[in-house]
Amino acid sequence: EDADSKSKHKPANVIDVDKDGSTDDDWRRANVDSVICNLYKAIQEVKPWVRFGMGIPGNWTMKSKAAAAYGISLPSGISAMESYDYLYCNAVEWAKQGWVDYLNPQIYWSTQVTRQNYRVLCQWWSQTVCENFSNKLPNGQRVQFCVSQAAYGATDADAGLSGYGDGVVEIQRQIDANRDNLSSGYTGSVFFNTSSYILLFKDLKESHFQHKALIPPMDWKSKTQLSAPTHITLIDTLLSWQHPSAERFTIYAYPRGMTFETAKNDPQYLKGVVYGYNIRLDGYGDLSQQTIAVCSYDRYGVEHAAAFYEGNEVFIPKQVIFWELNGGTIDVELPTY
């Protein structure tokens, strides 16, 4: 059946898989690669801000020959279903070529088992795949890495997943393992499935997700510089502003005297993402003693210029735009308001 399919659909300019020494499995992977590559390119042409990624089984392969072709090692002691061989999904190639915005390996095994250990696989994806490939793409592009975790293993005893007897504690151990790999590429968690995650939500909110967070930015795609919001007003707890083009904004409230950069790096000061031009800041303490920042926030998850409110005073820092011109730069300083 494969031979008939190859004979019917293989383009004339493609070398015969038998003659070049590759196998039917290589041919299948090449076809999957083609779908991923062409779909990614099509999305970039129409809506480049749409995030395109793939959820694949948490174990890439156990074949040393496949790893050697990419100059990488395999995770030690792992024995599990392989996406490379069973599904013909070569996620390492997608990361190397930058054909996806994110990879979502489904590591549905626990930290308590040996042959499919969560920590080992999480570290391999973030350090081996991200550091060797997705963090070395041209023009600042990165393939972001977020693990899919088996929330259902912690809530459904009938799921039969080994090592999940501790319930939410196992999920917390996994999140800790993820965060151990922040420097090499980890950007977040995906939980399967929603109904199970809802049962864990209260515990996780109290332990690991106490504050709001922004999605990882795709700053290499963002091309337009958004100006700061204007006409900020605060009436009681209703904060309002105006902007000619931006449609969503990030809001911060932090102690006066603290720098904005410091506040941005501490999630307790992020008060929300707003689609629109106002927000209620109820429950955030005495606003008269805080600096409130409103940041233009684009579709790529990139924060742009901010405006600041302190009491009745609104101020917008000087903004500098750089134009590249014949190898040099021209600095244009916009006025403050």
Residue map of PLM features:
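Short beta-strand segments within Ig-like beta-sandwich modules, predominantly Fibronectin type-III
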Residues: 269-276
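Extracellular low-complexity, O-glycosylation-prone stalks/linkers
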Residues: 246-268
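Substrate-binding cleft of secreted/luminal carbohydrate-active enzymes
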Residues: 88-115, 125-221
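Conserved aromatic anchor
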Residues: 236-246, 332-334
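Proline-enriched interdomain boundary motifs that mark the N-terminal boundary
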Residues: 223-232
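Polysaccharide-binding and catalytic clefts of secreted carbohydrate-active enzymes
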Residues: 1-99, 108-109
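Extracellular fibronectin type III
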Residues: 297-331
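Beta-strand-rich modules
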Residues: 255, 281-304
